[in-house]
Amino acid sequence: MIFDKDDFKAYDADLWNAIAKEEERQQNNIELIASENVVSKAVMAAQGSILTNKYAEGYPGRRYYGGTDVVDVVETLAIERAKEIFGAKFANVQPHSGSQANCAAYMSLIEPGDTVMGMDLAAGGHLTHGAPVSFSGQTYNFLSYSVDPETELLDFDAILKQAQEVKPKLIVAGASAYSQIIDFSKFREIADAVGAKLMVDMAHIAGLVAAGLHPSPVPYAHITTTTTHKTLRGPRGGLILTNDEDLAKKINSAIFPGIQGGPLEHVVAAKAVSFKEVLDPAFKEYAANVIKNSKAMADVFLQDPDFRIISGGTENHLFLVDVTKVVENGKVAQNLLDEVNITLNKNSIPYETLSPFKTSGIRIGAAAITARGFGEEESRKVAELIIKTLKNSENEAVLEEVRSAVKELTDAFPLYEE
């Protein structure tokens, strides 16, 4: 028996009500977490499809089970669309997450204990770029590079000097909280100069790369990884790209049977439909609006001397704000904004002096509000509401004004049209 919504509600009211509350929360909140987005109904339909029933260890044409002709078609669609989007010769669409994709990439490029350079977490890197608490930092000898302490920009001369000193087998480029353009060609020059491989994690900027609004790493990286959500607006999952056939074989083996069993073909289907959406000309307009909205919000903060934007601005979908002149730390800011239905996250800033559980900064992203239809005017209004909240944290009347303004915005831009 396949449940419809009424069946589901009657059968498991507790779970139904929890999901309904989350739907209400998303509708009534302004979502600024840079790693979140709003998927289409088509993506949700594919992910909730009957494909969830099918086990399909292996790859199209090379499965361990029978009855896989249809899922082979589904997975091949996802692969071919990913290759078309990013101009790559090979694509693996099976990783369950970006972290799984990174793990498989490392397994394809280096050996345990090898020296690797990755971006410092506080400077904008990611846990899987060598943090001691991550499998990456525990399996490989990661050494972090940072940004210039004055400009807060990547310092390629310093990165080259460090690479010449430590002689890494692999350099990892890409970030989870860096608001400027990354020059991947320079990273490749450094890697070549020291005999290292280059891996790029473009999880945050993949949608901008797909739209031609950020330089692509694919021509320069030996392996490129990404998530399929964030700016790509797809389901939660991972993707690995390469132009090297030998590496493609290693990647496939690293994913299956290396670190995963059967792929989640319902998620692969959701990736496929989201990739079709990315190939639509309308996606480029969406991605351009994401950057416009990010810049519009950043400009409001730049005009207020009580706040400091890391690196002085943004050229992508996100930016970091040092809030310590106004509130105690980023965690306090995050909690205050939660109370007025604005959702974002505390975030470390370069050369952070506070713990990662408190932080000096907050991270603000424009992908989700742009998906709802917010424009530059609404984005500026959102930034003003953030500032108003943080500067009036003890004034309940002002906070209620902010809540009302948030409600007006979310009502004007529904999460999904009926």
UniProtKB/Swiss-Prot annotation:
This is Serine hydroxymethyltransferase. SUPFAM superfamilies: PLP-dependent transferases (SSF53383). Pathway: One-carbon metabolism; tetrahydrofolate interconversion; Amino-acid biosynthesis; glycine biosynthesis; glycine from L-serine: step 1/1. InterPro entries: PyrdxlP-dep_Trfase, PyrdxlP-dep_Trfase_major, PyrdxlP-dep_Trfase_small, Ser_HO-MeTrfase, Ser_HO-MeTrfase-like, Ser_HO-MeTrfase_PLP_BS, SHMT-like_dom. (6S)-5,6,7,8-tetrahydrofolate binds at residues 121, 125-127, 355-357. Its main location: cytoplasm. The keyword Cytoplasm applies. GO terms for biological process: glycine biosynthetic process from serine; tetrahydrofolate interconversion. Homodimer. It comes from Streptococcus pneumoniae (strain P1031). NCBIfam families: PRK00011.1. It is an enzyme of class 2 (transferase). The modification N6-(pyridoxal phosphate)lysine is found at residue 230. It holds the Pfam family SHMT. It is found in: Cytoplasm. One of its GO terms (cellular component) is cytosol. Keywords: Amino-acid biosynthesis, Cytoplasm, One-carbon metabolism, Pyridoxal phosphate, Transferase. GO terms for molecular function: glycine hydroxymethyltransferase activity; pyridoxal phosphate binding. It catalyses: (6R)-5,10-methylene-5,6,7,8-tetrahydrofolate + glycine + H2O = (6S)-5,6,7,8-tetrahydrofolate + L-serine. Belongs to the SHMT family. Catalyzes the reversible interconversion of serine and glycine with tetrahydrofolate (THF) serving as the one-carbon carrier. This reaction serves as the major source of one-carbon groups required for the biosynthesis of purines, thymidylate, methionine, and other important biomolecules. Also exhibits THF-independent aldolase activity toward beta-hydroxyamino acids, producing glycine and aldehydes, via a retro-aldol mechanism. The record marks 229 as: Plays an important role in substrate specificity. Its cofactor is pyridoxal 5'-phosphate. Its EC number is 2.1.2.1.
